[in-house]
Amino acid sequence: MNPQPSGMTWNLLLLTWLVALISTLSALFIGEVMGQAPCVLCWFQRAFMFPLTVILAIACYRSDFTVWRYALPLTVIGAALAFVHTLLYAGLIPQPIQPCTATGPSCSGAGMTLFGVVPLPALALFAFIIIAILLIIIRRRTTP
């Protein structure tokens, strides 16, 4: 017998979708409006964030609280990529294996920070972590 999801659980699902939506719209704004071309790792992170926006929107519409089963793997992989990207940005990964500087745009520019302080890869990592935490909370509230 599954516990009956409360209105609070649906609000958490909505919040999860909003985090994914804001992340997706922000990435599109930076790339399309500001004209900043994403690096290779940014593209991979987008490949995991963009589908989350659609999946979580459908889950909200259908009140599908089992969404964690297929959204959490995307979130964990996206977070792992964002973590590696953050380490690259911080210079903690050696130069020879940095995919961002070999060809295409670099992650080391000043345009890769929010307000000149928080790097965009760290923001992506934060978004993936928030989504993962919310999905785990939803799972715990709806699974016996």
UniProtKB/Swiss-Prot annotation:
GO CC terms in record: plasma membrane
GO molecular function, one term: protein-disulfide reductase activity
Locations listed in the record: Cell inner membrane
Family, similarity comment: Belongs to the DsbB family. BdbC subfamily.
InterPro entries given in the database record: DiS_bond_form_DsbB/BdbC, Disulphide_bond_form_BdbC, DsbB-like_sf
Keyword Cytoplasm (UniProt): no
TM ranges: 10-29, 44-63, 70-87, 116-138
Organism lineage: Bacteria, Pseudomonadati, Pseudomonadota, Gammaproteobacteria, Pseudomonadales
Keyword terms, alphabetized: Cell inner membrane, Cell membrane, Chaperone, Disulfide bond, Electron transport, Membrane, Oxidoreductase, Plasmid, Redox-active center, Transmembrane, Transmembrane helix, Transport
SUPFAM superfamilies: DsbB-like
Pfam families: DsbB (PF02600)
Listed name of the protein: Probable disulfide formation protein
Membrane topology per record: Multi-pass membrane protein
Disulfides per UniProt: 39-42, 100-107
Free-text function comment from the UniProt entry: Required for disulfide bond formation in some proteins.
One BP term from GO: protein folding
